[in-house]
Amino acid sequence: MTFSSAADFQDEFDVIVVGAGHSGCEAALACARLGCRTLLLTLNLDKIAWQPCNPAVGGPAKSQLTHEVDALGGEIGKMADRTYLQKRVLNASRGPAVWALRAQTDKREYAAVMKGIVETQANLVIREAMATDLILGANEQVLGVETYFGTCFAAKAVILTTGTFLGGKIWIGGKSMAAGRAGEFAAVGLTETLNRLGFETGRLKTGTPARVDKRSVDYSRMEPQPPDDEVRWFSFDPEVWIEREQMNCHLTRTTAATHQLIRDNLHLSPIYGGFIDSKGPRYCPSIEDKIVRFADKESHQIFIEPEGRDIPELYIQGFSTGLPENVQLAMLRTLPGLENCVMLRAAYAVEYDYLPATQCYPTLMTKKIEGLFCAGQINGTTGYEEAAAQGLVAGINAARFALGKELIVFPREESYLGTLVDDLCTKDLREPYRMLTSRSEYRLVLRSDNADQRLTPLGREIGLIDNRRWQLFQSKQANIIAEKERLHETRIKERDQVAIAIVKDTEQKIKGSLSLADLLRRPSLHYLDLDRYGLGNPDINLAEREGVEIEIKYSGYLKRQQNQIDQISRHSNRHLSPDIDYMKIETLSMESREKLTKIKPATIGQASRIGGVNPADINALLVYLEMRQMSAVKS
């Protein structure tokens, strides 16, 4: 690291963001929109917000994150709505807590549109450079960064959003090269700086499948996966809702020949050949991992997805591998429909450095260096949506730090975004982290449809929601409240013609009279049915109708979960001072003392989720806090 006395600054900023992927773009835009002069450093100005793996946004839990980022004033949801090739709602037959919108996006259009947004954003400067060193003050606080060629930039806060580029190395078979992703060089120097400053770093692995030429594929041998007829939106802002022609994806499957070919060549893969031992993503395994871990499965689904409207490349989802190129091509040609395929890009594995996020506060500022924030894959996550969510959190807090304002913690009970950050900062994760609906204990109340209700008021308070968005939000909430009141107050009598028709269709009796709200609570009846019987409200839109139906139909469950949240939060949100010396609290087990000392949780709730800290330790900690408070009062 360089100290300020040795630095000759070329320019001064409030915040510097290192890396212009999905995390870096959200962070930089948030900082600039909050009034901070911001510098966004990238290794390649032509690869801003690139989608190096699957060009898609959303899916289970990831769609909730995307809606939440949008509700706070972020960009990823708008980007997906502007550039989609296909949209589908996954899990539509199940409850609203797990509904998941997914968009296949146009890879090049996505990057071009985002590049235009960051280039025209006020307060935001973009520069092509590799940051290799941090410039620190006398108290080891951040003062700026130094690039590979020795240029120094000053800043009050720095956000590291380095993706897979820190010490990146790509592998195909037993051969490797230094690269953050294929065709782009790795970032050097920064890992060594972090190590010198006392940070723990580790290695993780991910991978991407081959791309094939769509002109060499026989679609008649595959099952079409059409888009939904009714287009849904990630953003709560109708200004970015662009209706456009959609494209099919396709489904094929692995065969016995595929599996045999993989088994015969396992020794040539980077992992099974022993060339690398970094942990890969559990929920996005390579095809080799699938064949080994699920040896009893005769076949695996493979989705064939377009990467753009005007390019020939197809993404082979579910077929990532690190096997040699000649083996890859032979494997691809065992898939029905791909017997004569032409491979345009080979699949590869990539390993990279990361910084376990237990070294960060839930604000994503590091505990060791004041003013240094980390977001995205450097924190051990995988996925564009996880990266974007962290980028927004880090951007908001870096801006507030630079402006001398109090930093914000997003509680896990109020958002998936909060759950994500809490897990990262609390749990000792040693494999790439992916957001899942099962990771949230509060998923009934943390739905996509109410992300704006939960987070837009906070986005407004922070300063990321403008007057137009705020008026849209207030109008929607007022319409939902008014419609719920109407449904509770409007009753139908058993002798009414409409009631007789409903009884006949549903085979459920109406005794005396029934409110429309009680009618809507029936499992088999939906708001669309109210419309059919002339009982709906034509003045409210689809999102408002869904919000009304969910809140009425699931009101009992939602109330119960909200009560649980309120009960837990009484103790969970109790603050733990960073100066507590846990090693001196003898009523704690030694393991919990060590874990608490290492992680320094911000709240009792965070402490309770640390592995090795049991309920008895939490009780002892609560007693300690009471005694500490009493002695403070006495003194």
Swiss-Prot record:
The keyword Calcium does not apply. Its cofactor is FAD. Its main location: cytoplasm. Keywords: Cytoplasm, FAD, Flavoprotein, NAD, tRNA processing. FAD binds at residues 19-24. PROSITE patterns: GIDA_1 (PS01280), GIDA_2 (PS01281). One of its GO terms (biological process) is tRNA wobble uridine modification. It comes from the Bacteria. SMART domains: GIDA_assoc_3. GO terms for cellular component: cytoplasm. The keyword Cytoplasm applies. It is found in: Cytoplasm. NAD(+) binds at residues 280-294. InterPro entries: FAD/NAD-bd_sf (IPR036188), GIDA_C_N (IPR049312), MnmG (IPR004416), MnmG-rel (IPR002218), MnmG-rel_CS (IPR020595), MnmG_C (IPR026904), MnmG_C_subdom (IPR047001), MnmG_C_subdom_sf (IPR044920). GO terms for molecular function: flavin adenine dinucleotide binding. NAD-binding protein involved in the addition of a carboxymethylaminomethyl (cmnm) group at the wobble position (U34) of certain tRNAs, forming tRNA-cmnm(5)s(2)U34. Homodimer. Heterotetramer of two MnmE and two MnmG subunits. NCBIfam families: mnmG_gidA. Belongs to the MnmG family. HAMAP family: MnmG_GidA (MF_00129). This is tRNA uridine 5-carboxymethylaminomethyl modification enzyme MnmG.
